[in-house]
Design a protein with these regions (language model features):
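Non-heme Fe(II) oxygenase catalytic core, chiefly the N-lobe of the double-stranded beta-helix
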Residues: 1-177, 182-212
Length: 212
């Protein structure tokens, strides 16, 4: 189990259980497409999310299949993306550190939390399916291409996730639990429930014991 999150609070006495509690005083910030913690060199392979107390209407979570997104690409795009790598960092979590202590706090956090390099196209170690491995929240730029080319490529890839054909949507009830493969999916928490509150707890699992 991942030992904790660099920004989000945890359940008292349980460092590895992340507390995601949002309302008007603590507005949600997960309403964009992302994979959990890809700024780490070894991101979690799975996430488990528990709906402790959820709104009756709204607050759904969407998941997108990144293998389906990859399969939708033309052969030309697949060839061009194969072998490329991208830098992932903590993204807008910078805002939290800036509020705490200005730019010095941001710089310290960047050094402490670190960045990671991941392949743009990965192969799932169990299914063998290829999947797209970039996300809006944490993928900063593609290595060894110009900034303009990197921006163009990433924006093209990000907008593909908007297609409903690649998505599934889950409506939470109190004590619902969702488990997903963090490698081959991305998710989006819909921010449509304020002023109601949404109380979730999450753990992330680092190692897949099926992978030798």
């Amino acid at each position: 189990i991942d030992p904790g999150h660099p920004v989000y609070p945890h359940v008292e006495g349980f460092q590895s259980i992340v507390l995601l509690k949002n309302d008007e005083s603590s507005r949600p910030d997960t309403n964009d497409w992302h994979k959990d913690l890809t700024f780490k060199s070894n991101p979690p392979f799975a996430s488990i999310l528990h709906g402790v107390s959820v709104p009756k209407i709204g607050g759904d979570t969407l998941w997108a299949s990144m293998s389906a997104v990859y399969d939708s690409l033309t052969d030309g795009w697949k060839e061009d993306l194969e072998g490329l790598e991208a830098i992932h960092d903590m993204g807008t979590f910078r805002n939290d550190f800036y509020k705490e202590g200005g730019i010095n706090s941001v710089n310290s956090a960047l050094k402490k939390v670190g960045s990671a390099v991941h392949k743009v196209i990965e192969k799932h170690p169990i299914s063998g399916k290829k999947y797209l491995n970039v996300n809006q929240s944490f993928t900063r730029n593609i290595l060894n291409v110009s900034q303009g080319a990197s921006d163009h490529i990433l924006q093209f890839l990000f907008q593909l996730l908007a297609r409903p054909e690649f998505q599934v949507r889950f409506h939470w009830q109190n004590n619902s639990v969702a488990i997903w493969d963090n490698r081959i999916t991305q998710h989006y928490a819909v921010n449509d429930y304020l002023p109601n509150s949404r109380h979730m707890q999450r753990v992330t699992i680092i190692n897949d014991k099926r992978v030798k």
